[in-house]
Amino acid sequence: MAAAKAEMQLMSPLQISDPFGSFPHSPTMDNYPKLEEMMLSNGAPQFLGAAGAPEGSSGSSSGSSGGGGGGGGGSSSSNSNSSSAFNPQGEASEQPYEHLTAESFPDISLNNEKVLVETSYPSQTTRLPPITYTGRFSLEPAPNSGNTLWPEPLFSLVSGLVSMTNPPATSSSASSPAASSSASQSPPLSCAVQSNDSSPIYSAAPTFPTPNTDIFPEPQGQAFPGSAGPALQYPPPAYPGAKGGFQVPMIPDYLFPQQQGDLGLGTPDQKPFQGLESRTQQPSLTPLSTIKAFATQSGSQDLKALNSTYQSQLIKPSRMRKYPNRPSKTPPHERPYACPVESCDRRFSRSDELTRHIRIHTGQKPQCRISMRNFSRSDHLTTHIRTHTGEKPFACDICGRKFARSDERKRHTKIHLRQKDKKADKSAASAATSSLPSYPSPVATSYPSPATTSYPSPATTSYPSPVPTSYSSPGSSTYPSPVHNGFPSPSVATTYSSVPPAFPTQVSSFPSSAVTNSFSASTGLSDMTTTFSPRTIEIC
């Protein structure tokens, strides 16, 4: 413990290294060989001198000790191994320190073995900016420190740096007795840091496997307070929360460029329609359930080609309407679905109509994954898929024939309607032909029959029979002399001769009334016979 107190008194502002210089993967590790070279060039002769040098002489010198951020350096006065504190190569040798254990502070002190330290920079003479800090610190082993890479005292050191107030920044020579008074009895750390470098302490994150935010419970939401001069400032979200200051390499953002489009994280100059395009960018492909037979044939290369094709498609410039001011048939309040493109004022009453219209702007066409055909409408793709699957959901109600498309069934139904109309025309024609023979029969049969049958018979039968019989019988037998010699002969001749001319005139003038003519003729003959030949009736 006395050796640790002596080392704290020997430190000067130009010889104190970065408190975080020994941290693994720290940015200050790149400058550590320069610091060690400076320390060896300035303070090595004092540590390589006589073994029994007094403690006061080493305190007045400006040599450096081996305790950078850890503070556990080599003693130069009271033990026999003080002459071997630094070997000729400039590396610190191992010395027994009972108050520091290897479990709690293994790789921080310069007395331990350094793997990353190289002293092959003789030409570089640039010095680090001077860092001055005052205060006291204590390193005690943590009881439950299972992680040897990040012991608990170091995190208490970081917590003390963040939660400090504004103490006056003085030189270390003025406060060195206070720092060495009770180094092992005061666990808390109060330290002021002043530097001309405005870069943060941690510019890169340590790559430990499972980062835990409980390691830094206090620094969240705090910043380094400013002190006199250009103080070291830090952004408000401290270690776990800040993205630029404390980057934990868990899942880099550059591995997920496509998720930014899905979340709408685009540039401000993009159109509002870009988000909608990214939402509907995936092509409308054939459902996998309908192409089970083709699943083994179509590999992932086709899908990758499709995705790359549609990812490379850009929004086409929107077409202006031919008549933008022409009113639509449907009022606007009944068309709630408006096109999201800025220069397009189309509105639709149905969402599927809007989706179909958006494909005009995006150029997206649903594609069949079996035949790789593109279609302008998704319903056309659905109909096309049925040609591969053999599905025919539309059946004819008359004959039961099935079709894959509804318009095919409608076209087929028209065939049945035409056949039905033809059958109706044929049945009407057959009914008309069956009613025609019953209607014209009275005209063609009943009317000509009296003219041909009943009319000639009285003229040939009833008329000649009384004339020759009644005339010849009295003339030849009964009245031979009066017929040729008396008065009845001229009257009979004149009367009989006048009857035939009157009868043809009646027949010619009244051809339709054949019955009446025959009756009148018979009546005239009967009167003539009864008048001129009374015996005719008896003979007949």
UniProtKB/Swiss-Prot annotation:
GO terms for molecular function: DNA-binding transcription factor activity, RNA polymerase II-specific; double-stranded methylated DNA binding; hemi-methylated DNA-binding; promoter-specific chromatin binding; RNA polymerase II cis-regulatory region sequence-specific DNA binding; sequence-specific DNA binding; zinc ion binding. Residues 1-105, 162-240, 317-337, 407-482 are annotated as: Disordered. Residues 167-190, 427-482 have a biased composition (Low complexity). Residues 64-75 have a biased composition (Gly residues). SMART domains: ZnF_C2H2. It is found in: Nucleus; Cytoplasm. The record marks R335, R346, R350, R356, R373, R377, R401, R405, R411 as: Interaction with DNA. Keywords: Activator, Biological rhythms, Cytoplasm, DNA-binding, Isopeptide bond, Metal-binding, Nucleus, Repeat, Transcription, Transcription regulation, Ubl conjugation, Zinc, Zinc-finger. It holds the Pfam family DUF3446. InterPro entries: EGR1_C, EGR_N, Znf_C2H2_sf, Znf_C2H2_type. SUPFAM superfamilies: beta-beta-alpha zinc fingers. Residues 192-201 have a biased composition (Polar residues). The keyword Plastid does not apply. The keyword Phosphoprotein does not apply. Transcriptional regulator. Recognizes and binds to the DNA sequence 5'-GCG(T/G)GGGCG-3'(EGR-site) in the promoter region of target genes. Binds double-stranded target DNA, irrespective of the cytosine methylation status. Regulates the transcription of numerous target genes, and thereby plays an important role in regulating the response to growth factors, DNA damage, and ischemia. Plays a role in the regulation of cell survival, proliferation and cell death. Activates expression of p53/TP53 and TGFB1, and thereby helps prevent tumor formation. Binds to DNA motifs with the sequence 5'-GCG(T/G)GGGCG-3' via its C2H2-type zinc fingers. The first, most N-terminal zinc finger binds to the 3'-GCG motif, the middle zinc finger interacts with the central TGG motif, and the C-terminal zinc finger binds to the 5'-GCG motif. Binds double-stranded target DNA, irrespective of the cytosine methylation status. Has reduced affinity for target DNA where the cytosines have been oxidized to 5-hydroxymethylcytosine. Does not bind target DNA where the cytosines have been oxidized to 5-formylcytosine or 5-carboxylcytosine. Belongs to the EGR C2H2-type zinc-finger protein family. PANTHER family: EARLY GROWTH RESPONSE PROTEIN 1, KRUEPPEL-LIKE TRANSCRIPTION FACTOR. This is Early growth response protein 1.
